[in-house]
Amino acid sequence: MKKLKVALLANAKENAPNFEELSEDQWDDLDSTKTINAIVEAIKSGGNDCEFLEGNITLVDNLIKYQPDICFNICEGHFGDGREAQVPAILEMMRIPYTGSKVMTLALTLDKPMTKRILHWHELPTPEFQVFERTDEPLNDDLRFPLFVKPSREGTGMGVSGKSIVKDENELREQIAKIFKRYKQPALAERYIEGREVTVGLVGNLVGPVARRLPHDENLPRIQTGLHFFPPMEVDLEPFKESDVVYSNRLKVDLADQLNYVCPAPLDVEMIDDLNWYAAAVFRVTGALDISRVDFRLDASNNWKPYILEINPLPGLSPGISDIVIEAAAEGIEHHELVNMILDTALRRYGIKKQASINY
């Protein structure tokens, strides 16, 4: 059996556009050359050929030249409200299989308010919120301070700092204005949940009939068939409590190698069971595929009730730094094994036979 030709599609930071109007954190969610090289080598270690292709306007020509059997997609995109969906749209036009979620899911989940509307409709717990298109929009009567304010369509904690927690109208308007000026997009304000922040990573695909709403039957299975859940992770923010009371962009980017990642997070079995169930539910209602990471806040004032913040169907895969990589490592799964788990999951979904596999 011949080796598969796998194209790693990514947006490298060193290849990103550069001009004066860009904010200083514009490309924080793009991948480093180190990460890209690590994923290429991981795919090769699974017995397949792999080549990195930049996910920009050169992609179509390079795909025609390389003729991949499947693409391993981690492209974040450069511009546009649906930038994470742009490369998958090209791949679907060219009828090339790829890992991860499809166009609609990637466009949806980049838009945090739209995702929260979907979660709310499905009766999944997410903090009450309001979207601000103007700085002078009145605050809804049902929202109370403190609120948490962030850009509607950014990742990697961009636009998030200790000042994102606003306690009055003046602070709210100040943060909204900053987001408008810096990111040129609507601001999302949601009820601030005082408590702990944890994240759950998962690989796989749902099998069989799955409820779209929370089941009322307590005897139904709590863990969805077909998904592999990694141990939940929590970041210890105690050493940074004077400067960063939340998991900010500064911590995620500038200080990532100095953080204490607690994984598995100290949670009881019932809480982990609930988090996994909610993660599976979000995975289902957003149409995610192959891999995702779901972020939660646990409400200290309400018996640590979980609230869903967002789902990331394109979680970072930087060795030793990205959340889902750390979660997998806590289970004894090394970086190259995780990468091949994701690839193998997509290959099974497409019915593509692989050359080799790794025992996990």
Residues of each region from the PLM?
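ATP-dependent carboxylate activation and anion-phosphoryl transfer catalytic cores
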Residues: 120, 266-360
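ATP-binding N-terminal substructure of ATP-dependent carboxylate-amine bond-forming enzymes
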Residues: 1-98, 104, 109-110, 133-139, ...
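Hydrophobic beta-strand scaffold residues
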Residues: 50, 97-98, 126, 147, ...
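Active-site nucleotide/adenylate-binding loops and adjacent lid/helix of ATP-dependent enzymes
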Residues: 1-10, 64-67, 107-196, 204-209
